[in-house]
């Protein structure tokens, strides 16, 4: 019997490189060379397939790139990236070029025939007209004590009013200003022009609602979800009316079916006609749907963001996001989640080595599972924290087995900073200056169902009025692990553990509030039966929020801890140099060799036994946060793209010196937003040397051959024969 072996030879898939440039053309160019690029990234996306790369030449692009049902493959993704390290910007704003006229006093106005929901002057966000006043420049938008208003509701007097009503508390702020709603004589409930309240009436949740009725210091609104409304401190501010525009840097948009009227108070009495004013008109520059293996690399985004939906194994890497998201409250959209950077129903995705700065809304939300957010910088995130998904946090990851690693985060509004989903890993993060505009909250927050398998390790959590890391909920959570974290200068406990069978190992918590315990292993709410607390150091470790260890011993197994309640020592003196972030124990410290071996946790210890706390004397001095410098990489402030002047390839002068032709072959364009053919009047030329001079700096003609342009000029001077 003979056997025949049939061998099929499959040709490897060929990858293509496509090029996009401001000076390109979607109709006549094939996009396959730098000389014949496409004009838009969106067009390139329509012809790309697995393994293809779109190289984008330097410039500012205002477009929406839709990618639907176009998968890459493992090792052959669809890649969108810059060309040759040139700076590529996706801009979600447009210039406000219409004429401004004075409206009243310092307030100017103009009409526009499009909607905007964020205003910028010289690329800096301006404040939506509000009461009480606040500013971005001094971060007073985060100061709820002095620049928000307050309700009379207190936890000690919980029945003053119900959900859907708020009674204002008259008070004086730190600048001596009386915050009295009734004294303002506002018309908050004018039909179709109602004020919008940003209402923190749910402790760690905030909603925006239109004001339904108003008398004196009392107003009503459509109730928020009843099970989320809390009888704790209430705080709020108001937007949505022209009468709130009473300070420089504020703006208001009076929306209308055909023409919108835009009002603005320019700083220092300036004429807005002379300012660089732009408005946000776009939520997303990239919308990727049902397309796996799509990658965005080395791109910058101003006033716009990305959205991935059902797009597994996609990546965002080395990108700079400046003002990526904003609420549409100025368009009278209340109770609506802002369009934030989002990866939805997608798994095995990653966001790495990128910066997210100045958001209204969460920095990023992911759902799906096995997603990674690593080595990113987050700053000035969400000054309202309203109308968000779930717990309304700065970064939300849902699904299972996510990783949040090596990130730096500071100046954050939401009470809870990061939620990681079920069985998440949080490690090597540097988080501080958080929780400014809501009550309650923790920097790393784990609710009941998320706790089994969750690991929180090697983090720096500090300088915040919130909890550091918390296993929270109704007490049913279990089997979470916290180890080798350092927490300092907190206004609440560094560690809180509700539930049971948790493991709390080798943590250092110092410089706590004094009236709260540093490590809290709750006796109530789960009771912590089976929990193990071992090798930790803090001044106050207890089973109660504020009561002593002697009165409230830590439940479960408790041993080999340095607890100031027991020793009477101030543990902050036991480390080498806390001020310079050296949390290793002093060589003669009682912490050295005072711990006990925990398999998988203390394996690399030196000496006769592990040290107590997060660091080993003589061991690895690990650090937390990003491993790059945001100012070096992306700058400390936004800088607009400046297109370099074209370099002239050659010059041909007529024999009689009467004319000159200049040739160039460079990326040249005359406008980003209002494109038209290049004209002679778009150019100016100067020459030096010799006796000839230009009759005019403006060319007499411009001709094109492919991407080579020829400019013609008349000369004056003495002919050389």
Task: Write out the residue ranges for each language-model feature.
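Sec-dependent N-terminal signal peptides
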Residues: 3-11
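Low-complexity, Pro/Thr/Ser/Gly/Ala-rich linker/spacer regions in secreted
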Residues: 11-15, 620-649
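Extracellular polysaccharide-degrading/modifying enzymes targeting complex plant/algal/animal polysaccharides
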Residues: 19-310, 314-338, 596-609, 621-633
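Extracellular beta-strand solenoid repeats
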Residues: 55, 66, 79-81, 89-91, ...
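Predominantly extracellular beta-rich ligand-binding scaffolds that present long acidic/polar faces
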Residues: 63-79, 478-584
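Short glycine/acidic-rich loop motifs that flank beta-strands on beta-rich extracellular proteins
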Residues: 64-66, 304-308, 325-333, 337-339, ...
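Right-handed parallel beta-helix
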Residues: 292-302, 312-325, 347-361, 370-384, ...
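Non-catalytic beta-sheet/beta-sandwich ligand-binding modules that flank or precede catalytic cores
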Residues: 641-721
